[in-house]
Each structure stands twice: as structure tokens, then as C-alpha cells.
Amino acid sequence: MKTLAIELRKGKRTGVIPVLLAVGVLGAAYAFVNFIVRKDTLLNLPLAQMDVLLTQLYGMIMVLNLFGIVVATCMIYNMEFKGSAVKKMYMLPVSVPAMYLCKFLILTVMFLVAIVLQNLALAQIGMTDLPDGAFEMGTLVRFAGYSFLTSMPVLSFMLLISSRFENMWVPLGIGVAGFLSGMALANSGLTLLLVHPFLIILKPAVAMSAQPDSTVALVALVETLLFLAVGLWLAKYRRYE
């Protein structure tokens, strides 16, 4: 708990917490504005109303989420490399793996808050603007959980990368390259390509149905835990030089 409290204070100073809150607010605002501008067009699409609400608005929200994750994960470790602070921690009564885990938990919780804010906006749109009886809260909750889970491999992967590179531009570059390569492969049906975490986060955005894909969800969970485990192992056994 002491390590978590310290990391929370660091998170406020580095701006990680405000960044992810801003992602949630901007995503919610985008959903409102987009639906207001394109309401008639969206409601006339040959799709179920809930599919329109969730899949047609999620694309830009996903981009905001992805770059919010990339920026936040880069920022959360940037402070640790200043003055070689992370190297000195091995000589202090501080568990570096515990610090890594706390950073992961802080990012996860704050990203979950962002997802909740965005989906509250979608819920408000659904209840007020969709035809009577078309809005389904259960479908919204499932899609929200699915979009959160499919974003976690990128969060876990980017935290791992950020923890190993002192120069913040390296993980930023990897994040941008990951997004571009994911976009290029987004419409591929090859299951093998799901090893690419930046492809998984795109799956809800390119789907025409709001129903979660169980295969994608399972791979997302496995990748999240795998990247987390690798990051914890490196924090414990591979000291910073």
C-alpha cells in the first residue's frame, strides 16, 4: 500500500492521471458531437440501432484511447529515468517489481475510468436519441467491457517497453508504428495476427456488430497477463545499467 501511495503521488506529478481523465472526457464529448452532427445518417444505416451506436462512434474514441495509453505509459516511467533514479532504487528498501505492478494498476484503473466516462456518454445518447425500445443496457455494458479488455494488451505492452528505454521517444515511436501497422492489418481475418496487440485494440472499431468476439477477448487477456509477467520478471532480474 505504501508503494501504491507513492506511485499515485508520482502519477499526479507526471500528469498521467490527468491525461487519462482527459481521454475519457474527450471521448465522451466526441461521441456527443459526432452523434449530433451525423444523427440522421447514422440512424439510417442498415444496421441494428445498438450496432450503430457502439461500432460507428467507437473508431475515433479508440484512437483517443490508444494514444492516451501510449502517452501515459511513456510519461509514467519518464520520471524514473531522470537522474538515474530507477538505478538507485535497487539500493533502497523498495521493491522495483512492486513499483512496476503499482504503475500497471494505476494505469489500468485510470483507463477504466476513461472507458466508463465514454460509455456513460453513449448510454445517454442511446436512452435519449435511439428509437423507443432500441437501447439495450446489457449490450452497452458487454461492449464496454470488451473494448476495455481489447485495449489492455497495448497498455501492458507499452508499459513494458517504456520501462526498458530511458529515451521517451523510443516507446512513443514504437506506439505510433504499432498503431500504423495495426491499421494496415485491421481487416485481416487471420487469427495468427492477433499476436499483434495493436491489432486487437482495433477489433471493436472495425467490427460491424457490437457483440464481443470470444477469441479476441481470450487472446487479449492472455497477452495482457503475458506482457505484465515479462515486465515484472525484467524488473526483478534485469537491473537497469
What are these regions (language model features)?
Residues 1-24:
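Aromatic- and glycine-rich beta-strand/loop motifs that create alpha-glucan
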Residues 19-25, 165-183:
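Pore- or pathway-lining transmembrane helices of multi-pass membrane proteins that form conduits
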Residues 24-71, 101-165, 206-211, 215, ...:
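Secretory targeting signals
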Residues 33-53, 172-241:
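Terminal transmembrane helical anchor/hairpin motif
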Residues 67-81, 156-169, 224-237:
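Transmembrane alpha-helical segments in integral membrane proteins
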Residues 76-108:
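Helix-loop-helix units of permease transmembrane domains in multi-pass membrane transporters
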Residues 77, 86-89, 121, 125, ...:
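Hydrophobic alpha-helical interface/terminus motif in multipass membrane transporters
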